[in-house]
Amino acid sequence: LHYPHIDPVIVGFGPVAIRWYGLAYLTGFVVAWWLGNRRARGLHTDWTAQQVSDVIFYGALGAVLGGRVGYVFFYGFKQFLADPVWLLRIWDGGMSFHGGLLGVAVALWLFARSTNRTFLQVSDFVVPLVPPGLGFGRLGNFANTELPGRMTDSPFGMIYPCHADAIRAMNPLCTGQWEDFARHPSPLYQAFAEGIVLFAIVWLFSSKPRATGAVSGVFLISYGLLRVATEFFREPDVQLGFIALNWLTMGQLLSIVMIGFGIVLLVLSRRKAA
């Protein structure tokens, strides 16, 4: 298989351009808004349509700001020190889920305060809406030729073009290993895991009344496990490589921390329910 030629820019108007990456995020937010309204009606909650719109706005802002800042500090701090304006060039790609999670957590805390709800009440409502956006974001990564996988001889392997900007950033000399060997299309694996499998798990679990914090805990555990698994197909970030044990990546380390927090939330929620 060969990577299909995908222009990252859908349409350009002079210096302004509409990109697949941005469209992926926008689609994720729209789907989250639609699911949120459906969830509010289906569970007969006290959430109004306006509150759903407001929390999606808060969450979107937190996701974009936190995702970019998190990527810069978790994965590209040296580049930031050399070129601080790089932090603002979101259109070049480079978003961190874990940074976005922290940004969304802050946003939901602020929203919870404004609506006299607890943070966990808000997060339990919101996290089932998140996975489709994660899946669309991974498709945006694929359109940008970002996050290529490790070399493989499996039938799913894909040959990435050496001329793509994201590939050249990882391999400036454009050596033959890129166009002579197939690699796992890891963004597609992660789109399936995070956008479909995670959505099915969390949505089904949250379809019945649960103790406060349980849905958030299941989300953290499920995402963490799926991310740890799919990272084994993904090439480590070139600026970091493996950070421990010659196999542990930054994404896996942060996901293991997530799993720990998720277990704590799940245990505490069960104790409260008991």
Regions found by a protein language model. Give the residues of each.
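A feature for loop-to-transmembrane-helix boundaries and adjacent hydrophobic helices
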Residues: 1-274
